């Protein structure tokens, strides 16, 4: 029997977002007090992300029985991430030149108050590639889970799963136990997701109530350019990749619409991570590929963030009437490819990576970030939506490359069949 429309999760989340926007606009003081609802939901999701990643990755690797395969999947994933991320950076740069969102501002650099972005600049200077690599190694196993650091948990899971794989049948009992624990945590996620509309309402009401729709007006061109560019990236770049892999990007987006709406409401792509992993398995991707690709993509495959970074640099240079040479722009691209990974997992990562990138081009003052500080919150939704879509597509692509994509199940799900399907033999 079909559910009444008002009981469907994405309908509830969409309605909650609309109500949140209305409350924020008409009753801003009351709306600001709704912030704990959004924060609470995100905290509930973050509470289970670590255990889910650990159990899923360990179970997947232990089931491979071949560490060469683990390295092969990881290598293909990183190669894919780097190529697609570079496309995103270039598209952001080109779009900035085509639409010129910063032209006409004519801001005097001496009139900018840099105090508001000083903390981001300081963090950018203290963050290096070496620091990033060292921070992947946790001081203790417990510390990694206590902080909820995805990369640290992923490292522990890789080592633990590799050890179980090497032990073979002797470790089967442990592998089965961890697999059952994963099912328990996914069930917890289902329970938490029931309150997603409340979280989306609280987060959206706070955003509109605190910043107001009026604050967007002076920078609407930049916001519009960024959203349009992100849509073009998803439809064209990810669309072509999806078509070459054998599925439609539009049907894929429709398939993960609930996760996208949760991300839209909370501005946090992490809030949908557990559900995305489960959805990818139901789509026909193998558990081992899902466990490796999706968590890794949350640090190394940030397409929306990459578009934002290069476009923001161009916007600031145009607003300050600073001409960038071709060499400087190529340098920005090269540095952004590194900084976008080096600050993953850090609070305010988008601004920190932007500060680190600007620091390489002395002609653009880091203080110029003040110009977009006020609207960054409104652009974060688009970054998160693009990031999660890109990671979902990457998971399907890597599964296809590994010949571990169940195309029968993929075709059924993409055609609208959401019921249980009998797994067919995986095909390329």
Curated annotation (Swiss-Prot):
Topology in membrane: Multi-pass membrane protein
Main location: membrane
Molecular function via GO: fumarate transmembrane transporter activity; malate:proton symporter activity; succinate transmembrane transporter activity
Cell membrane found in the keyword field: yes
Alphabetized SUPFAM superfamilies for the sequence: Proton glutamate symport protein (SSF118215)
Keyword tags: Cell inner membrane, Cell membrane, Membrane, Symport, Transmembrane, Transmembrane helix, Transport
Membrane-spanning residues: 5-27, 42-64, 77-99, 150-167, 188-210, 225-247, 314-336, 351-373
GO cellular component, one term: plasma membrane
Keyword field contains Ligase: no
Pfam family name, one: SDF
Subcellular location: Cell inner membrane
Function: Responsible for the transport of dicarboxylates such as succinate, fumarate, and malate from the periplasm across the membrane.
Membership in a protein family: Belongs to the dicarboxylate/amino acid:cation symporter (DAACS) (TC 2.A.23) family.
Name of the protein in its database record: C4-dicarboxylate transport protein 1
């Amino acid at each position: 029997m079909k559910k009444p429309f008002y009981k469907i999760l994405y309908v509830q989340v969409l309605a909650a977002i609309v109500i949140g926007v209305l409350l924020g606009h008409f009753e801003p003081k009351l709306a600001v007090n709704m912030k704990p609802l959004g924060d609470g939901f995100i905290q509930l999701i973050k509470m289970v992300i670590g255990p889910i990643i650990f159990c899923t990755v360990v179970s997947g690797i232990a089931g491979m029985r071949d560490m060469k395969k683990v390295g092969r999947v990881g290598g293909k994933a990183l190669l894919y991430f780097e190529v697609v991320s570079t496309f995103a950076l270039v598209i952001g740069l080109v779009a900035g030149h085509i639409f010129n969102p910063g032209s006409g501002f004519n801001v005097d650099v001496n009139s900018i108050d840099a105090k508001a972005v000083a903390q981001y600049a300081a963090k950018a200077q203290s963050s290096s590639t070496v620091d990033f690599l060292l921070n992947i190694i946790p001081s203790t196993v417990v510390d990694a889970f206590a902080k909820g650091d995805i990369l640290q948990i992923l490292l522990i899971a890789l080592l633990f799963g590799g050890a179980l794989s090497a032990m073979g049948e002797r470790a089967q009992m442990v592998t089965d136990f961890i697999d059952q624990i994963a099912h328990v945590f996914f069930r917890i996620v289902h329970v938490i997701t029931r309150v997603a509309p409340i979280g989306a309402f609280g987060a959206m009401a706070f955003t509109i109530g605190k910043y107001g729709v009026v604050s967007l007006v002076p920078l609407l061109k930049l916001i519009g350019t960024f959203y349009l560019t992100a849509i073009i990236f998803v439809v064209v770049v990810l669309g072509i990749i999806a078509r070459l892999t054998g599925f439609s990007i539009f049907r894929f987006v429709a398939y993960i619409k609930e996760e996208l709406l949760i991300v839209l409401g909370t501005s946090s792509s992490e809030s949908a991570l557990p559900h995305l992993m489960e959805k990818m398995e139901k789509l026909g991707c193998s558990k081992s590929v899902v466990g490796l690709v999706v968590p890794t993509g949350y640090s190394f495959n940030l397409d929306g963030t990459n578009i934002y970074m290069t476009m923001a640099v161009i916007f600031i240079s145009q607003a300050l009437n600073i001409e960038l040479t071709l060499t400087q722009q190529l340098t920005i691209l090269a540095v952004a490819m590194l900084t976008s990974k080096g600050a993953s997992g850090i609070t305010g990562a988008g601004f920190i990576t932007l500060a680190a990138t600007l620091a390489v081009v002395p002609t653009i003052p880091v203080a110029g970030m003040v110009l977009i500080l006020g609207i960054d919150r409104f652009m974060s939704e688009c970054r998160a939506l693009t990031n999660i879509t890109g990671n979902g597509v990457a998971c399907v692509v890597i599964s296809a490359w590994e010949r571990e994509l169940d195309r029968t199940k993929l075709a059924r799900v993409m055609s609208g069949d959401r019921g249980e399907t009998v797994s067919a033999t995986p095909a390329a």
